[in-house]
Regions:
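Short helix/loop capping segments that flank catalytic or ligand/cofactor-binding pockets
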Residues: 21-24, 139, 147-149
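Beta-strand-rich recognition/accessory modules
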Residues: 120-122, 137-140
Length: 191
């Protein structure tokens, strides 16, 4: 018999003291350099410190639940959705992103129902760390566990990468070129 259980979603985002959500992609994410820099820094943080993030959700009961008869798996992965994945792939392949995918019209096939727009950000229910519109959902934490440990880990690993990015950009002769190159480099290495 498989083990089933319940977990919780830790909705994690970064907001400035002025209330600006740094994970808000806007209507044209391919043009939102601040968002792309923050996003790719977080990808690096999760990629390089997946072990710490995994440990933050580890305990005997939760380890039996993860990867069993329900999602998410016990392995850390990041899901960005079609829109952001496409933007980063454009950067990698051509050096620039020229457009962002938008939601498609979803044809219900029922004449009495109107067509409606499908969300371009998707929702992947199996990834333990998924981007969902303007935040990440960390889905590994057990239902009885506190989210405090995973938040300490997320904040710390992100802060380390932000510090490194700031040091590099502050030392650059041409900020615009340096930030573009950094976003492309982080995309290439960490997606």
């Amino acid at each position: 018999a498989g083990v089933n259980g319940s977990g919780k979603h830790n909705n994690w985002s970064l907001t400035t003291d002025d209330g600006i959500n740094l994970l808000e992609p806007g209507k044209t994410p391919h043009e939102n350099i601040q968002f792309l820099l923050v996003l790719t820094c977080i990808l690096k943080a999760v990629d390089e410190h997946a072990d710490l993030l995994r440990e933050s959700a580890a305990d005997v009961g939760n380890d039996e639940r993860l990867g069993g008869n329900e999602a998410p798996p016990a392995v850390i992965s990041v899901f960005l959705g079609e829109q952001l994945q496409d933007v980063l792939e454009q950067l990698i392949s051509t050096g620039t992103a020229t457009h962002s995918k938008t939601g498609e019209i979803l044809d219900t096939g029922v004449k009495t129902l109107p067509d409606f727009m499908k969300d371009a950000t998707d929702r992947n229910r199996t990834s333990p760390f998924a981007f969902t519109g303007n935040k990440f959902e960390f889905r590994m934490v057990g239902s009885r566990d506190s989210i405090s440990e995973c938040n300490v880990v997320l904040n710390t690993i992100a802060a380390e990468v932000f510090r490194d990015a700031c040091d590099r950009l502050e030392a650059a002769d041409d900020f615009d070129t340096a930030v573009h190159d950094l976003i492309k480099e982080l995309s290439l290495i960490h997606i």
